[in-house]
From Swiss-Prot:
Chain's gene name: PRS1
Catalytic activity: D-ribose 5-phosphate + ATP = 5-phospho-alpha-D-ribose 1-diphosphate + AMP + H(+)
Keywords for the protein's UniProt record, in alphabetical order: ATP-binding, Cytoplasm, Kinase, Magnesium, Metal-binding, Nucleotide biosynthesis, Nucleotide-binding, Phosphoprotein, Transferase
Biological function: 5-phosphoribose 1-diphosphate synthase involved in nucleotide, histidine, and tryptophan biosynthesis. Active in heteromultimeric complexes with other 5-phosphoribose 1-diphosphate synthases (PRS2, PRS3, PRS4 and PRS5).
Protein's recorded name: Ribose-phosphate pyrophosphokinase 1
Pathway(s) it belongs to: Metabolic intermediate biosynthesis; 5-phospho-alpha-D-ribose 1-diphosphate biosynthesis; 5-phospho-alpha-D-ribose 1-diphosphate from D-ribose 5-phosphate (route I): step 1/1
Length: 427
């Protein structure tokens, strides 16, 4: 590839080097270091004048340092008269902060987009942005590549009887992503909903556990069809809107039985003033907020909401369940969803599948310890240490470097990259 330079940052050198290897070129030389006072220093060791420059820098545990390194690299290439600068960011940092959740908050993802453009980026390439609307944050072209085809290919090759499996969204905000994968695999899908407020109202008005059982039974109308008049007289048509609704209780992130006593009722019931203050937060148990375009589940659950109602809309009995999300950050919502699928809904196996394996803190270890989860599948857009990979028996990592390499090659030669968005392009 003539007139092309690829710089690999410190965030994920393994992925960057794999991309360069597939393209048959060496990473462009540059010196990345820190001064004694913590400032980042970047020195480019080659001319970039009139060259196509690609800077590969993903999210990482040292996220703020790596963002600064990316901005300085882009700015240095702009100062070196590069013809075009493309920031390749496999896992876009701060993507969860893509909307204002509280008054006086900041839309940090938009701010980062502005910083990239101001530094000199002409083009941005990423994969599975937390919300596709984030592409509108940029005033430059953005290519949001899909990890779904690679995940679908792995499912076809490794999930037994995948034709009978069910793709599950663990919150309402992820249904669009789930239905897209289910359509490409031609299999069924289901959705999990966790209601904090319903559980709170129930306990604040009825402290008797029997009331909870009665309410749950009223929700368990499995396969009850809706009858409507047919097209001809005396003809009725059965319309089944769903294959079943299974509801259970969650306490402190784990599914509990209906007959389990309320050990800490005082922790569940708070003063009226506290109830009023939390009612103002339009939040969702497993899915951040009730905004359907978002799917955050990593907010700390207040004491009041530690007991919740979790509901599956769909049928996974005797089937493999594939819980799909864009990233795995913290384990709580995945574990509670998997436990509900296995213990109450009869799932045969549970696969946790995501594009970005962030695994904050001991997330991977907690998922590993869960008996309800059989396999964890992620791509290598985010760096995972070799020690953690070696210590996990459930983790599977899919290499997506061919997708980024092909994207760079096609972009450099002015070819269309629409094939990378095709459901068959599981490279």
């Amino acid at each position: 590839m003539r007139k092309c330079k690829i710089f690999v940052g410190n965030s994920h050198p393994e992925l960057g080097n794999m991309v360069c290897q597939r393209l048959g070129i060496e990473p462009a030389p540059c010196t990345l270091k820190k001064f004694a006072n913590g400032e980042t220093s970047v020195q480019i060791g080659v001319s970039v004048r009139d060259e196509d420059v690609y800077v590969i820098q993903s999210g990482s545990p040292s996220i703020n340092d790596d963002i600064m390194e990316l901005l300085i690299l882009v700015s240095a290439c702009r100062g070196g008269s590069a013809r075009k600068i493309t920031a390749v960011i496999p896992q876009f940092p701060y993507s969860k902060q893509c909307k204002m959740k509280r008054h006086r908050g900041a839309i940090t993802a938009r701010m980062l987009a502005n910083l990239l453009v101001m530094a000199g980026a002409d083009h941005v390439v990423s994969m599975d942005l937390h919300a596709s609307q984030m592409q509108g944050f940029f005033t430059k072209p953005v290519d949001n590549l899909y990890g779904g085809p690679s995940l679908a290919k792995w499912i076809r090759e490794n999930v037994e009887d995948y034709e009978d499996a069910v793709v599950v969204s663990k919150n309402p905000g992820g249904t669009k992503r789930v239905t897209a994968l289910a359509d490409s695999l031609k299999i069924n899908f289901a959705m999990i909903h966790t209601d904090r407020r319903r559980s709170k109202d129930l306990y604040s008005q009825n402290k008797d556990l029997q009331q909870l059982k009665l309410r749950k039974q009223s929700m368990l109308r499995k396969n009850r069809p809706i009858i409507r008049q047919g097209d001809h007289p005396n003809e009725e048509e059965n319309i089944i809107l769903s294959n079943g609704i299974q509801t259970a209780r969650i306490r402190n992130g784990h599914v509990i039985g209906d007959d389990e006593a309320d050990d800490d009722e005082d922790a569940i019931l708070e003063s009226d003033s506290e109830l009023h203050s939390i009612d103002g937060l339009d939040s969702h148990g497993l899915g951040g907020t009730y905004d359907a375009v978002d799917s955050e589940d990593e907010e700390e659950i207040p004491v009041l909401y530690r007991e919740q109602l979790i509901t599956l809309v769909g049928n996974v009995r005797g089937r493999s369940a594939i819980i799909l999300d864009d990233m795995i950050d913290r384990p709580g919502s995945f574990i509670s969803a998997a436990e509900h699928l296995v213990q109450n809904c009869g799932a045969k196996k549970v696969y946790v599948v995501a594009t970005h394996g962030i695994f904050t803190g001991d997330c991977l270890e907690e998922l590993e310890k869960s008996d309800a989860i059989d396999t964890i599948v992620v791509t290598n857009t985010y760096p995972i240490s070799g020690e953690r990979i070696a210590g996990s028996k459930k983790l599977v990592t899919i290499d997506v470097s061919p997708i980024f390499a092909e994207c760079i090659r096609r972009d450099h030669y002015g070819e269309s990259i629409s094939v990378l968005f095709d459901s068959l392009a599981a490279l």
